[in-house]
């Protein structure tokens, strides 16, 4: 991990590392957090080896691009609000391009998942019960089909190393209260809707995604945090491949880490330590991440 004068490491997740000013006691005693996106890649609740070259920069670029367009309160520290110093000038050169300065929030233990299309674990559950997370769906749907309306299917955010757990909306009420649960659902569906509309204009489908929210410590405002609509948190498909002339597999060719998931599913039984990713899988995944950023942002 990179040593950075003036900052101290306080936490590492699967992909991101958190730092606070060296004078702060910790996350609860600071108004500024440096979030550094690494090149680590995770799947099936495991961090894999090797990482994906350039992934941290691509995730950060995409999150910043989306935060600027989604019209939702977010945890970024505006560049002009730090006294006597612009926010971007506080970011150490060693992690420039893969870092964000953010406000600390009281995070909710909920993964706010929105599905616009039936696929992944939702498709598996639908085949058994014709529902997803307790929400009944029409009969006769196939893998990759667009849902009549996007659905909100929350999950309990497990500690690092444990499995996230799909939960009912009623369970979210028990965890965070009825008012907060309702706001999380409303915000998640609204942000997904705005993001999906923007992406479709650029020839990309957001099949599903997950958001994380926290409460502002001073005002209590529910605020979008962590990453947003990245290749790690979302399934992205090429809109040009959705016509009937393509096979289901071709229609769902993704701009995300589905390549990694598919390779692991075919080469690992999910017991013990996952195998190292082959160079070809690493290169293909990096290429898809870059292609998405280029498609969406034009950069």
UniProtKB/Swiss-Prot annotation:
Gene3D superfamilies given in the database record: ATP-grasp fold, B domain, Phosphorylase Kinase, domain 1
GO BP, one annotated term: 'de novo' IMP biosynthetic process
Keywords: ATP-binding, Ligase, Nucleotide-binding, Purine biosynthesis
E.C. no: 6.3.2.6
UniProt xrefs under PROSITE patterns: SAICAR_SYNTHETASE_1 (PS01057), SAICAR_SYNTHETASE_2 (PS01058)
GO cellular component: cytoplasm
UniProt pathway: Purine metabolism; IMP biosynthesis via de novo pathway; 5-amino-1-(5-phospho-D-ribosyl)imidazole-4-carboxamide from 5-amino-1-(5-phospho-D-ribosyl)imidazole-4-carboxylate: step 1/2
Highest taxon, organism lineage: Bacteria
Cross-referenced InterPro entries: SAICAR_synt/ADE2_N (IPR028923), SAICAR_synth (IPR001636), SAICAR_synthetase_CS (IPR018236)
Substrates-to-products reaction catalysed: 5-amino-1-(5-phospho-D-ribosyl)imidazole-4-carboxylate + L-aspartate + ATP = (2S)-2-[5-amino-1-(5-phospho-beta-D-ribosyl)imidazole-4-carboxamido]succinate + ADP + phosphate + 2 H(+)
Keyword flag Nucleotide-binding: yes
NCBIfam families: PRK13961.1, purC
Similarity comment: family membership: Belongs to the SAICAR synthetase family.
HAMAP family in UniProt: SAICAR_synth
Protein's name according to its UniProt entry: Phosphoribosylaminoimidazole-succinocarboxamide synthase
Organism: Leifsonia xyli subsp. xyli (strain CTCB07)
């Amino acid at each position: 991990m990179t040593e950075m004068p003036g900052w101290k490491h306080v936490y590492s997740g699967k992909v991101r590392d958190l730092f606070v000013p060296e004078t702060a006691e910790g996350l609860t005693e600071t108004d500024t957090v440096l979030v550094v996106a690494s090149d680590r890649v995770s799947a099936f609740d495991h961090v894999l080896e090797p990482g994906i070259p350039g992934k941290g920069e691509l995730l950060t670029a995409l999150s910043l691009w989306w935060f600027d367009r989604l019209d939702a309160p977010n945890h970024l520290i505006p560049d002009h609000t730090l006294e006597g110093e612009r926010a971007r000038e506080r970011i150490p050169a060693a992690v420039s391009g893969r870092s964000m300065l953010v406000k600390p929030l009281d995070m909710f233990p909920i993964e706010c998942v929105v599905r616009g299309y039936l696929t992944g674990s939702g498709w598996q559950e639908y085949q058994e019960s014709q529902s997803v997370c307790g929400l009944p769906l029409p009969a006769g749907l196939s893998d990759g089909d667009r849902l009549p309306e996007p659905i909100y299917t929350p999950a309990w955010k497990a500690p690092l190393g444990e499995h996230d757990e799909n939960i009912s909306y009623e369970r979210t009420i028990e965890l965070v209260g009825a008012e907060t649960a309702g706001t999380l659902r409303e915000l998640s569906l609204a942000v997904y809707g705005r993001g999906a509309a923007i992406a479709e204009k650029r020839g990309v489908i957001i099949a599903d995604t997950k958001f994380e929210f926290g409460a502002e410590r001073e005002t209590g405002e529910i605020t979008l945090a962590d990453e947003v609509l990245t290749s790690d948190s979302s399934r992205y498909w090429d809109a040009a491949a959705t016509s009937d002339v393509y096979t289901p597999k071709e229609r769902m060719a993704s701009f995300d880490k589905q390549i990694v998931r598919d390779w692991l599913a075919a080469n690992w039984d999910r017991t013990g330590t996952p195998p190292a990713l082959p160079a070809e899988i690493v290169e293909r995944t990096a290429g898809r991440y870059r292609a998405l950023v280029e498609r969406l942002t034009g950069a």
